Curated annotation (Swiss-Prot):
Biased composition (Polar residues): 22-37, 141-154, 240-261
Origin superkingdom: Eukaryota
GO biological process: cellular response to starvation; gluconeogenesis
Protein name: Transcription activator of gluconeogenesis ERT1
Stated family: Belongs to the ERT1/acuK family.
GO terms assigned for molecular function: DNA-binding transcription factor activity, RNA polymerase II-specific; RNA polymerase II transcription regulatory region sequence-specific DNA binding; zinc ion binding
DNA-binding region: 88-116
Localization of this protein: Nucleus
Lineage of the organism: Eukaryota, Fungi, Dikarya, Basidiomycota, Agaricomycotina
Length: 548
């Protein structure tokens, strides 16, 4: 009874429904708080994953929901057309795709099956053989001849109007073949100079004996030359070259007396300066009488009826006395006797045998055997200073010499005898190039050594200062002897400050030149210094312009 009473006296406990536990969560349970996260957890839907992996069969760019899907492209029917190795002439001209069959399908469709032939593939000129190149030139040169014949046959002009003769094939510029005598190192350059020679030297078409002589040409025409000069220029041994074209290689390429001179050995020279010629130089070849006779007209004789004399080229020689006609052509005497060439005065020029550029350089190598003595020039300067200058000017010049002379001595000490000979050969070769450049310029120019010894003189400088060419070149004249005292001091000071500076820059200053009579010639003066292989000041190039 007591036990039943005890159970009845206890208050009833509230009933809590048991919580449901998922077995899967129990397996994945981890250590941590017993409370579950309050936020709802998203469940991955399997349908979405299948949608992402699903591929549509629609073409690119068209989504399944696009309102206007594009139609699918139709595949190309038949096999792909293969390009031919070489197109036919019509397809090549129209830039269309051809096939290997002849006639090709395009020509069959266009009704050109009978004319379907292999197209001509153009080949680069530098890949052509000599035979192909000659054939190309002949085909091009025959075109003007055919056109001339057609125009002559179809013309309706009255008979009084002369019909132009067809252009001769042998005079065509395209037939100017490659001449190996040109020493330019390139076949293209050689051919270009051959064509230039043909342009300048092609004679006019042959005329019959009944044709009246042409009107007299202008004063500076070649008709004013003597018959010997015309024969010399127009001779087949000279080729098509003439002497009116100035070439930088004119002085180095000289013709032999046998004159196997094609355009390669032709001398492209100009007329001499009339101011630099003396009266004794004009014996038997007066230009004034020839120019005056141009207005009267000279009959043009056939080539076989003119008196001939041995062809002779009168060129400048550095050892000749007349330096005024340097690198210039002088026509031979006017009389036709063979002995006229030997009777020409020796003061005009010397008959020079043709010399190529290589032979001229070879002569320099054979002639220069010892180095140049520069100490002699400085010794002359030391003797010359007390005779002209005061003590203050002498001190300024000596100070200027003391600036660069130690550097010269230091650079010359390690040089051997062969090195000094090589430097002198380079100096002589530079003079050859400078002589060519001076012939193209009309500016008074002088080239001298670092000691002041004059090496080259332009004729314009002689006209400016009235100094004879022989006195300046052949008598070992120094450039400072032609300067006024103050100009000498300024020159040596400028030379000392720029002797070892940038050789691409020039020094500009004022200079007063002295004539042989002592009259001053105020001028502007610029000079540049060239150094040799061993960095020694070697060549000084000076130019003047008079102050008017």
């Amino acid at each position: 009874m007591s036990a039943v009473y005890t159970l009845a006296s206890r208050p009833p406990r509230p009933l809590v429904p048991p919580s449901y536990v998922n077995p899967a969560q129990m397996q994945n349970a981890q250590a941590g708080p017993s409370t579950a996260p309050s936020g709802p957890k998203k469940k991955s839907s399997p349908t979405l994953a299948t949608v992402k992996r699903k591929r549509t069969d629609t073409p690119e760019g068209n989504s399944p929901g696009s309102p206007s899907p594009q139609p699918q492209r139709k595949g190309r029917e038949g096999p792909k057309k293969k390009k031919a190795n070489r197109a036919c002439f019509h397809c090549q001209k129209a830039h269309l795709t051809c096939d290997d069959s002849r006639p090709c399908q395009r020509c069959v469709k266009r009704g050109l099956a009978s004319n379907c032939t292999e197209g001509h593939r153009k080949k680069a000129k530098y890949l052509l053989d000599e035979e192909e190149l000659e054939q190309l030139k002949r085909s091009k040169s025959s075109a003007p001849e055919i056109q001339g014949n057609v125009s002559a046959a179809n013309t309706a002009d009255p008979p009084s109007v002369p019909i132009a003769e067809p252009f001769p094939q042998n005079d065509s510029l395209l037939t100017a073949s490659f001449d190996p005598n040109f020493s330019f190192g390139s076949e293209a350059a050689n051919r270009e100079y051959s064509i230039l020679s043909a342009i300048l030297g092609n004679p006019s078409p042959p005329e019959s004996a009944s044709t009246p002589p042409p009107p007299p040409p202008p004063p500076q025409s070649y008709a004013t030359w003597t018959s010997d000069a015309i024969d010399f220029i127009g001779s087949p041994r000279l080729g098509t070259a003439t002497s009116s074209y100035t070439s930088p290689y004119g002085e180095s390429m000289q013709a032999d007396t046998t004159l196997s001179t094609s355009p390669g050995n032709a001398h492209y020279l100009t007329y001499p300066y009339p101011q630099s010629q003396r009266s004794e130089d004009l014996v038997d070849m007066s230009y004034a009488s020839q120019y005056s006779s141009a207005g009267q007209g000279q009959p043009c004789l056939p080539a076989n009826s003119r008196p001939r004399s041995p062809p002779t080229v009168f060129l400048h020689n550095p050892s000749s006395k007349d330096q005024g006609s340097r690198g210039l052509l002088s026509p031979p005497p006017s009389n036709g006797s063979p002995s006229s060439t030997s009777s020409a005065p020796s003061g005009i020029a010397e008959i020079v045998r043709p010399q190529s550029c290589g032979s001229q350089l070879q002569s320099i190598n054979d002639r220069v055997l010892t180095p140049y003595d520069y100490t002699e020039g400085y010794h002359f300067l030391m003797k010359h200073l007390p005779t002209r200058f005061e003590k203050n000017d002498i001190l300024r010049i000596v100070r200027a010499l003391a600036i660069f002379r130690p550097s010269l001595i230091a650079l010359q000490m390690p040089l051997s005898l062969d090195d000094e000979v090589f430097v002198e050969k380079c100096f002589q070769r530079s003079l050859v190039e400078l002589d060519k450049l001076m012939s193209f310029s009309g500016t008074p120019t002088v080239v001298w050594r670092r000691t002041g010894e004059i090496c080259l003189v332009a004729p314009e400088f002689c006209m400016l200062t009235e100094w004879p060419m022989e006195d300046l070149v052949h008598q070992k004249k120094y450039i400072y002897e032609l300067f006024e005292n103050q100009s000498v001091v300024e020159y040596w000071e400028n030379f000392a400050s720029h002797a070892f500076e940038n050789t691409t820059q020039s020094v500009y200053s004022h200079c007063v030149l002295l004539k042989p009579s002592g009259a001053p010639v105020p001028s502007t003066f610029c000079f540049s210094i060239r150094r040799d292989l061993f960095d020694l000041p070697s060549i000084v190039i000076g130019q003047w312009l008079p102050l008017l």
